[in-house]
UniProtKB/Swiss-Prot annotation:
Modified residues (S-nitrosocysteine): 94
Domain of life of the native organism: Eukaryota
Modified residues (Phosphoserine): 45
Residues noted as binding heme b in the record, renumbered to the chain: 64, 93
Annotated positions of the N-acetylvaline modification: 2
Positions carrying N6-acetyllysine: 60, 83, 145
Keywords: Acetylation, Heme, Iron, Metal-binding, Oxygen transport, Phosphoprotein, S-nitrosylation, Transport
Protein name according to UniProt: Hemoglobin subunit beta
BP term (GO), one: hydrogen peroxide catabolic process
Function: Involved in oxygen transport from the lung to the various peripheral tissues.
Residue span, Globin domain: 3-147
Amino acid sequence: MVHLSAEEKEAVLGLWGKVNVDEVGGEALGRLLVVYPWTQRFFESFGDLSNADAVMGNPKVKAHGKKVLQSFSDGLKHLDNLKGTFAKLSELHCDQLHVDPENFRLLGNVIVVVLARRLGHDFNPNVQAAFQKVVAGVANALAHKYH
């Protein structure tokens, strides 16, 4: 559960309507893989991840990033039940993929960076604070199975 004021929730959901999930998802996952290269081990089947240009132009990275951000978008519809919304993904990432739950926090922070870059002045400090709450809540929900 994410505790947002009415103003924060309005800002998050309002700005989310301006987000191109396809583009932001690919950029966010790509940046995660470049900035935190140890995360690439989960994506060895994606082909060439040898440098930033290869990662950012990789169609499999873009496609999976889109899928990730679509799930994040679904979570925004269920801010009061993030653990329930992400329960199956938490189980998958814990039991089958063995992803370090710290990676969820890292991805959340990268999503915030990409949103700030793309939304410019609309992504003011108050909006950033609200989004940080949301990505922290999603990361916590995804890590829930690990506890």
